[in-house]
Amino acid sequence: MISIIVPVYNVGSYLPKCIDSILKQTCGDFELILVDDGSTDDSPQICDSYKEKDARVVVIHKQNEGLVRARKTGLQKAAGQYICYVDGDDWIEADMIEHLSEKMAETGADLAASGLYCESEDSVQKLHGKLEAGIYDTKEILSIMLYTGEFYEFGVSQFACTKLFRRDLLWDVQIQVDDRINCGEDVAVTYPYILRTQKICISDYIGYHYIQRAGSIVGCFDSDEYDRNKILIAYLKNIFDRSAYAECLLRQLNQYAKNLFLTRNIACFDVLQKDEILMPYGGIPVNARIILYGAGKMGQSLYRYLKGRDSIEVVDWLDKNSAVYQKKGMEVHCPDCLEKIQDKAYDFLLIAVNSQKAVKSIYRCLEEMGVNAEKIKWLREEFIREDYFILDAFA
């Protein structure tokens, strides 16, 4: 049997589509466990209505304690030998669970992993890890599972919801996750779980639809973000420290930590600086005039930081998908606007993208537009190469 666990918290408008997609699964024997994590909308009633109509549905109502506790609660109730997680505001293709379970049966793998569609109102993006489809002995991929060596690429994607787990291996991994973790909950499960496997199966199949909700992303920022990120990194460091492969795992974790703080709290790199900021970029004068290129997670992190400093002037914020971000209430413009901005109107153009491959393409485009190459800045090579730049803080 397969247990599909769905943590639910105030997702009433999305939940029916999620549940319907699961109940239409083509695989034979499965149960759906809905864990209502103290919802205050109509989610509890929706869960109960499905339980009344379908014997495969199990509903648990509990007080709000977060995603980690909700997953633990669902796992404790699960009767299946295999576990799949689905978020309550997402949905899956009808053959997803069957595909993953067949892969595990055919290969004898301890984990089956696939990709997902990241969907917003205006775009759909396919997301996979870097590893090609195939069967891997775990020892083969440990050195690149979290970081391939190119900033920033995952070897195996972090998403728990695109994977099928063995319950007996998942139990200890999930139960020991620090309940305080509410950032990177998937990372806290996926990679510690892989350490317990012998063989994993990577599929190029995509059957999971991750839905990005409407609304301004820039506004979604908590003052305790840095502390929450530190809890996650410290938790993973403790696990990796005890592994026989600690050296290569910690090296990857360091790179992941850099990426995490770049995209969520870039200010942490400048704690001891006075005359310059953005040390990952090699240092930018505190009174500089900046054009920001990139409005994804890293761009939003950087924009928040710069707008919070009175001495910095953000001349413009650019992204080729500006129309998408404008609908979310963000003041982002098309890169073509650069042609109207005089060279003397700004000091630096900062590329706020965490993909080394994408940066190379952006550099070429900017140079073709006549942007002064000396003004274009991205992460300095020393910052990317340094193996223990971040983890020294978690000694």
Please report, for each region that a protein language model flagged, where it lies by residue.
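Short, acidic, metal-binding catalytic loop of nucleotide-sugar glycosyltransferases
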Residues: 20-29
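Glycine-rich, basic loop-to-helix element that forms the pyrophosphate-binding segment
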Residues: 62-78
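Short beta-strand/loop segment that forms part of the nucleotide-sugar
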Residues: 29-38, 58-63, 87-88
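Short aromatic/hydrophobic "clamp" motif used to bind/position activated sugar donors
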Residues: 83
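Catalytic core of nucleotide-sugar-dependent glycosyltransferases
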Residues: 198, 205-213, 219-247, 264-281
